[in-house]
Amino acid sequence: RLGGGGCGVEMALMDLAGKAYGVPAYMLAGGKYRDQIRVYSDTPSKKDPVEMGNALKERMERGFTYLKMDIGIWISEQVEGGLVFPNDYSDDKLNEGSTGGSLKSMMVEAQNVMHPFTGIQLTDKGISEISEYVKIVRDIVGYEIPIATDHFGHIGLESCIRLGKELDKYSLAWYEDMIPWQYTNQWKQLKNSVDTPVC
């Protein structure tokens, strides 16, 4: 997302340099290391875990051997008391909303605030709801294939650690973007607190 433009320019420049030198661009990056690479299949968010499990299963049937799904605090909204909001996100604001009146609109507002500063926290009920979602998906897909995860939401480090510890039992491939990349000390804490790789 943030690096896409720069990466596109770099790839174009390497292609131009390769043409100028009469060599493939990969030679400028150190040479050829493999003939093929494994790709994963990302999957759009689904509120229903059975739908998500079936969507992942369909990707397996198409030959993908590595999967990725979005899980996050939007799952916790399905249970009352799943999230703790700051005072300025009272029920009235969530019902009327400064940008449309729903948890989704509040999340849009939160997109402009870095994760550690939103004040949004997962409760035990919220963590259980997300865990149950992943359990249902794993029951459908099985454990024979890696599943990576992304889009956890704008929550702080403590909620990320609590959620990560709960989800470790599902043998997920990795937790992606739980916190912003520039908070390196928090990444270290997260990495040292969970058994699943983080990126």
Give each language-model segment a name.
Residues R1-P146, H154-I161, K165-K169, S193-D195:
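N-terminal capping/lid subdomain adjacent to the active-site entrance of alpha/beta enzymes
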Residues T43, H151, M178:
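Conserved residues at beta->alpha junctions
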Residues G164-W181, V198-C199:
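Active-site core of metal-dependent hydrolases
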Residues H154-G156, P180-T184:
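Short acidic loop-to-helix transition motifs that present clustered carboxylates
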Residues Q182-C199:
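Catalytic alpha/beta core domains of metabolic enzymes, predominantly
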